[in-house]
């Protein structure tokens, strides 16, 4: 066994029996006791055991299936709103171009196929990559899949700050995208709130509502934006991103090999 110190208060090791060699459980347990943390948090360990039990079939399967269906319903609802707005701008959810309405979800429709425009990853290996339906990345206007900036745009940081002030907290924020996760317990009522707030953002943006009205906490922290409108702020940040080609700079930063 490797000498590893388990510092987490709820560390667990999952062991799958080998087909050719039986695990020496006594030796394994003694070795584990030698290197584990001396201060386990039993309440956390108990919660992990409860969570594992909840995931057992059939109840766990039903809970996961419900989360998957809610995530798909959210994507379909966002596309319905886009259709209702007609030629006006709206947010997109990153994912396959077509979604079935049948139950349960079909694994095939979430696979990434080579050179599909929606994912932009080029010639991916067939059957190797699949989009997790419960992880929804919402795309804001301003940057296309090729990394080209539009004349106007709405940086995701502005949208997520707006959402936070209206009671919606997102997981992660990029330049022109933000991420939400449909974990167990996310219901139609909760994601409907997100759709409603995004519609309200669109209305406030189109009307260039003053920031002191729609983002009062932001203005309180940064009084210099008191007389600026929501569209004005979005345009200013977008123009800065575009001027300095921030999308390409950040991409190169991660792809460039380290120079020594």
Regions found by a protein language model. Name each.
Residues 25-52:
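PLP-dependent aminotransferase class I/II
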Residues 18-26:
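Short helix-loop capping/hinge motifs at secondary-structure junctions, enriched
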Residues 8-9, 167:
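Short coil/turn connectors at secondary-structure junctions
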Residues 4-5:
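Short, small-residue-biased leader/transition segments that mark boundaries at the very start
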Residues 12-18, 55:
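Short beta-strand-to-turn element immediately C-terminal to the catalytic PLP-Schiff-base lysine
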Residues 58-258:
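Non-catalytic terminal extensions of PLP-dependent enzymes
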């Amino acid at each position: 066994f490797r000498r590893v110190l388990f510092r987490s208060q709820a560390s667990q090791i999952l062991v799958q029996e080998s087909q050719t060699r039986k695990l020496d459980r006594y030796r394994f347990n003694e070795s584990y006791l030698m290197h584990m943390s001396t201060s386990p948090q039993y309440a956390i360990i108990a919660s992990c055991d409860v969570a594992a039990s909840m995931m057992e079939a059939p109840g766990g399967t039903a809970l996961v299936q419900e989360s998957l269906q809610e995530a798909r319903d959210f994507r379909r609802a966002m596309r319905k709103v886009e259709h209702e707005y007609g030629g006006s701008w709206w947010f997109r959810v990153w994912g396959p171009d077509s979604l079935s309405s049948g139950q349960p979800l079909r694994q095939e429709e979430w696979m990434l196929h080579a050179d599909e425009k929606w994912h932009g990853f080029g010639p991916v290996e067939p059957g190797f990559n699949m989009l997790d339906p419960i992880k929804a990345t919402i795309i804001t206007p301003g940057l296309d899949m090729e990394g080209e900036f539009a004349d106007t745009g709405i940086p995701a940081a502005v949208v997520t700050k707006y959402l936070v002030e209206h009671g919606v907290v997102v997981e992660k924020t990029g330049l022109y995208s933000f991420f939400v996760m449909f974990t167990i317990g996310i219901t139609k009522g909760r994601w409907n709130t997100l759709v409603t707030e995004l519609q309200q953002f669109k209305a406030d943006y189109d009307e260039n509502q003053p920031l002191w009205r729609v983002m009062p906490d932001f203005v309180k922290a940064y009084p210099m934006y008191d007389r600026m409108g929501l569209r004005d702020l979005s345009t200013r940040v977008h123009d800065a991103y575009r001027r300095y080609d921030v999308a390409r700079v950040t991409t190169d930063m991660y792809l460039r090999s380290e120079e020594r």
